[in-house]
Amino acid sequence: MSDPSFDVVSEISRPELTNAVTQALGEIKNRFDFKGSKSDIQLEDEQLVLVSDNEAKLESVIDVLVSKMAKRGLGLKNFDFKSKVEPATGGTVRMKVKIRKGMEKEQTKEVTRIIKESKLKVNVTIMGESVRVTGKKKDDLQEVIHLLKNADFPFDVQFTNYK
């Protein structure tokens, strides 16, 4: 039997994101302060497009969306809410929020470094946009998960592919 292992990834659950957007749109449609507003959220492949009448309403759209995402367990570090607001058609404003998928090379190295500094008896392998952690004992793997959950990365980490 092979040793227990898991993968450390940085991904967004697409169905959960779709649900969060749908719930946010439902709340925007029913809220009094959005009556008659042209506010909208569109989910595209690699980004969210937020549209509203003005910057103040756009901030409210972001607040509604962020609250729905948090309730659905989506990590907010994988979304770039700091992009600039640009004018759109019909006197509206638009913001494109980039969705980050996977870990970059530097991020995988940082995860690997933190695990190796812990001196736990596990093997760490970088596999493209993820990191595979293998160990003889499940307790060591659980300690690694606890360590990574408490680490302050500029991206969200999830744990998948438990074997």
Curated annotation (Swiss-Prot):
One GO term describing the cellular component: cytosol
Sorted UniProt keywords: Nucleotide-binding
Molecular function GO labels: nucleotide binding
Alphabetical list of InterPro entries matching this protein: DUF520, UPF0234-like_C, UPF0234_N, YajQ-like_sf
Annotated Pfam families: DUF520
Disulfide-linked positions: none
HAMAP family named in the record: YajQ
PANTHER family: UPF0234 PROTEIN YAJQ
Family: Belongs to the YajQ family.
Function: Nucleotide-binding protein.
Record protein name field: Nucleotide-binding protein LBJ_2391
